Amino acid sequence: MRHMRPLIALSLAGLMTLSACGEDVAAKDDSAAGSSAAGGSNNSAPAKDGGSITVRGCTPQNPLIPSNTNETCGGNVLDAVTARLIHYNPDTAKPEMDIAQSIETKDNQNFTVKIKPGYKFSDGTKVKAQNFVAGWNWAAYGPNAQQSGYFFEPIEGYADEQCGDEACKTKPKVKTMSGLKVVDDHTFTIKTTEKVSNLKVRLGYTAFAPLPDAFLKDPTNKKWEKMPIGAGPYKVTDNTATAITVAKNENYAGAYQGHVDKVTFKIYNDASPAYNDTVANNLDINDLVPTDQLTNDQWKSDLSGRWAIRQSGINQTLTYSGKDKQLASNKDLVKALGMDLSLIHI
């Protein structure tokens, strides 16, 4: 019988998310108790280094480019593949220095960033200040139509990089933001249009990951969409319609080294097949419990001794389609529906 163990090798935000309950559910080693209460500690046994595991994945909605991935399916993969200036502690969510050696400011508008020497991308090239500055300029450039391009809006000159119209028939004034300057290989500066007190915290978002020289020289090459080059603890080795596999990045120089050698994100676009595979021990880690298994905590019985719960911050919204003419033209009806919905039952 294959043992289930916690995926502590990857920094996957919301790794074990219990749908609609605001809690995290994680598979645990069989030797550990599987009944920790919500908000309780995770008492799973220590995972051993090496080997491989399978994790529930889903089809990325966009290419695996840091600034173009803003959903969980692709985000979980890029969390393993990329390193950023800031790393979020998986237990406390507090920002910690990763590639950044220091981020200093006296006025929350002018920032000096120094990066640690020795970091490399998975292709063996060095991570330099230019990889951040050029990468951010490319990501913010309107014609590149990046899903997360708006993350760079606080930086001076962002507006000048945007298209003059929705169809982008009027090209931007510039291709680089005036608020970004390379000082040397390990130093660059950021100037924002106004004071931004939490900029340091934001710099851990995937969109701010540095882009390698190979990408910057040929950004339209389709291979980057499925086989990204990052500076994180893992690298993508295979990407198909049914699975995305990442293996340890031998060039990784950071403090967040992975424990397992290989992780395969098996693609499931429905919660039930993934759940059934988990129960049958054909899937090691699953972060989603089907709603029909939540009744009477059926999933706890099915996965006895192999689960854990922890608190998680989840933002959920309920909206209606703008194409629904009846709702779009009747604000009172929308309000009535909202008042009728009981949050207790959602």
Task: Provide a role label for each language-model segment.
Residues 237-247, 264-328, 336:
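Extracellular/periplasmic solute-recognition and catalytic clefts
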Residues 56-107, 229:
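N-terminal lobe/hinge region of extracytoplasmic solute-binding protein
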Residues 21-35:
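Bacterial lipoprotein signal-peptidase II cleavage site
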Residues 101-151, 189, 280, 327:
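Aromatic- and charge-enriched surface segment that lines or borders ligand/interaction sites
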Residues 186, 192-257, 262:
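Gly/Pro-rich hinge or "lid" segments in bacterial periplasmic/extracellular proteins
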Residues 104, 140, 144-213:
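Surface-exposed binding/hinge segments that line
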Residues 128-137, 185-191, 232-233, 260-262, ...:
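Alpha-helical secondary-structure segments
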Residues 1-25:
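Secretory targeting and sorting signals
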